[in-house]
């Protein structure tokens, strides 16, 4: 006859199983699962109840093209807007245009650059909280900025060598010093007009080269760096060389980068990273729940840039500290498993609920 099976075992077998997600609090109805169970999802569930594997508000949406990733994201965003959350979103395909207009949000067309939306890569993001500052860790603000600038240069020019990148960091620090900025600086009262631009960095490079009458190894590195930086202050100046022109007091900010996605690969990657870094700087107000949405995240991870992937992983790790939840959208898990960024990709997944 075979092995007898108790009736409780039979009752637990497919297709008789039934499950659902009914999060308490300010939840959004996402739909039903394969067994017909209702899915009521509260991204900030950890704030009201402890639950296994729900210890932060970070989420990743995966799916092939046309599978409904953006539709699901917009459902979640609508719920957060109604619940009074601050929204910061990077929108590569202009899919948030209607919802932004409906709810009175602000759209910044970064693809046009210049007066339409300039983000100064050298502006410092103050992402040290009060506890870190009390512990004397305020210097990490500038340290993280320098790391981000090195990541930016790797996106802008993947062929940049380590010696040129190290020299770039030294030159940037020298430029900051000319503006009264060092590791002990209190940035809390700084405005966008207080920071140097790439024009100032380029001037520092030229000044150091002119001070070296003879050809040396250091001068050779500086000259190679000059060639790398020059396009940033000439043909690409409307994207990278100027003071930040974007207001920072919006409750619903969308960065439209559709026009940017058609630009040259390295320029697109550098701009995407620069936008993400600035967007993270808008998510540091602990008095309100904030959502940071990053669509087409594979653009950042597909460039084999460890520093850039590490920045996204740091955002995932630090988001909870600032009452921020992330929505990272990409097409497939393999986007996070490239050998060059697999450590950071694992951290991005591990820090999602």
Q: Where are each of the predicted segments found?
A:
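P-loop NTPase motor domains
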Residues: 2-39, 45, 92-105, 110-112, ...
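Hydrophobic anchor at the beta1->P-loop junction of P-loop NTPases
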Residues: 61
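The conserved Walker
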Residues: 65
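Conserved lysine of the Walker
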Residues: 69
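Hydrophobic positions on the alpha1 helix immediately C-terminal to the Walker A/P-loop
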Residues: 72
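Post-Walker A helix-loop "phosphate-sensing" segment adjacent to the P-loop in P-loop NTPases
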Residues: 79-88, 103-106
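Sensor-1/coupling segment of RecA-like P-loop NTPase cores
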Residues: 319-336
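Conserved P-loop NTPase catalytic core
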Residues: 344-353
């Amino acid at each position: 006859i075979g092995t007898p099976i108790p009736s409780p075992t039979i009752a637990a077998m497919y297709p008789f199983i039934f499950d659902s997600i009914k999060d308490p609090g300010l939840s959004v109805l996402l739909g039903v699962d394969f067994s017909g169970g209702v899915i009521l999802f509260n991204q900030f569930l950890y704030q009201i109840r402890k639950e296994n594997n729900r210890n932060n508000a970070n989420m990743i949406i995966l799916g092939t093209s046309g599978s409904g990733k953006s539709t699901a994201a917009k459902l979640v965003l609508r719920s957060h807007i109604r619940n009074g959350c601050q929204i910061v979103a990077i929108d590569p395909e202009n899919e948030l245009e209607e919802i932004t207009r409906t709810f009175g949000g602000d759209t910044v067309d970064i693809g046009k650059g210049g007066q339409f939306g300039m983000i100064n890569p050298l502006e410092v993001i103050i992402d040290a909280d009060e506890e870190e500052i009390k512990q004397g860790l305020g210097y990490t603000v500038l340290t993280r900025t320098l790391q981000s600038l090195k990541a930016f240069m790797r996106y802008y020019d993947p062929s940049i060598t380590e010696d040129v990148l190290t020299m770039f960091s030294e030159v940037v620090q020298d430029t900051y010093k000319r503006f009264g900025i060092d590791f002990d600086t209190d940035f809390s009262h700084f405005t966008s007009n207080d920071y140097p631009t790439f024009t100032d960095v380029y001037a520092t490079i030229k000044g150091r080269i002119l001070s070296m009458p003879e050809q040396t190894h250091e001068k050779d590195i500086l000259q190679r760096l000059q060639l790398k930086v020059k396009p940033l202050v000439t043909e690409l100046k409307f994207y990278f060389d100027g003071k930040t022109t974007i207001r920072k007091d919006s409750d619903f900010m969308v960065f439209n980068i559709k026009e940017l996605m058609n630009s040259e690969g390295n320029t697109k990657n550098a701009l995407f990273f620069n936008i993400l870094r600035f967007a993270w700087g808008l998510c540091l107000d602990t008095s309100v729940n904030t959502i940071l949405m990053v669509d087409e995240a594979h653009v950042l991870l597909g460039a084999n840039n460890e520093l850039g992937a590490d920045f996204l992983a740091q955002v995932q790790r630090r988001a909870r500290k600032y009452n921020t939840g992330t929505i990272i959208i990409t097409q497939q898990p393999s986007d996070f498993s490239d050998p060059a960024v697999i450590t950071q990709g694992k951290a991005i997944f591990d820090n999602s609920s």
